[in-house]
Amino acid sequence: LLQMCRNMSEMGQKILYVSGEESLSQIKMRAERIGNFTKDMLLLCVNNLEDVEEYVKKDTPKVIVIDSIQTIVTDDVESAPGSVSQVKEVTARLMRMAKQTGIAIFIVGHVTKEGTVAGPRTLEHMVDTVLYFEGERNAGFRVLRAVKNRFGSTNEIGVFEMKGTGLAEVKNPSQLMLDGRPDDTSGSVVVCTMEGTRPILLEIQALVCQSSFNLPRRTSVGLDYNRVNLLLAVLEKRGGIVMAGCDAYVNIAGGMRLDDPSADLGIVFALVSSFKNRAIPSDMVMFGEMGLSGEVRGVSGAEQRVREAAKMGFKTCIIPRSNLDNVKKMKDLGDMKVVGVANIQQALEYI
């Protein structure tokens, strides 16, 4: 947010950054790493909401950042900072200020160990938008994801890379996610998913090995565990490939989280590839939702997905047959071969 404030102040917008956690010297240390700031970037280190309101009356900014809501208190409520009553009252007053003055207000909130916003759920209900800034501890990129948005889709994401001078936008997330992918390795499949209106190529990795336990292990990282078990059952019943005595581990490379059902086809073939120890061609990409009867269902945004795969240099794309007619009309795919499959048996035969 401090970096965002700097960028907006350079555009001539007056920004007020209110910190209840850090001193001016601490903020200065972070700011010097990011770069120089203009005179339109204003810092205020207070914990009292009345002080913020008084300052806004004197010099109205375009944007206010509250860091964080758990440290700001109002004299109208007699309770400790961060309590339910304080958070609700301070948020309500800030919301009223935003509506009356037209100021955009960003509120920083603490999160729990589970990754959700700490404090009362009414905090999420009162605001217009809830954004989570996610990232693995050892990963070099961060994902800005919306879970509530009154003014647009919640499926849009932004991908950023951490650098020495702060966060930088990743203009081509697909290239970042596939960087370092090994060639001719079993259990590795590339799928094209949609995050809002943005197609992103991700690598699904699977490892299937003989189990030494009576109850085989099933582990998934970045994917719904129940979804993986469901696809294993479909693979056994409709595809004739039995993995009942095997441990199965599935992972999304790069630490991403994937909820798109169009990745089903990729998960299935990553498992089959590892089970048979036969590599899927490195220039092949696929997507499609798998039904319980083994059918491959059509997905939305097929044209954007195929176009993204062609742009990244893939030569073969396996898609649901119901999407094939629209994709065949595309003229900008170069020499890419697009194959439509109606069910899991056809897909297995082609591979």
State what each model feature region is.
Residues 20-26:
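Conserved Walker A/P-loop ATP-binding site and its immediately adjacent core
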Residues 15-19:
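Conserved RecA-like ASCE P-loop NTPase motor core of nucleic-acid helicases/translocases
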Residues 2-6, 12-13, 28-42, 48-63, ...:
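Peripheral, non-AAA+ core regions of ATP-driven protein-machinery
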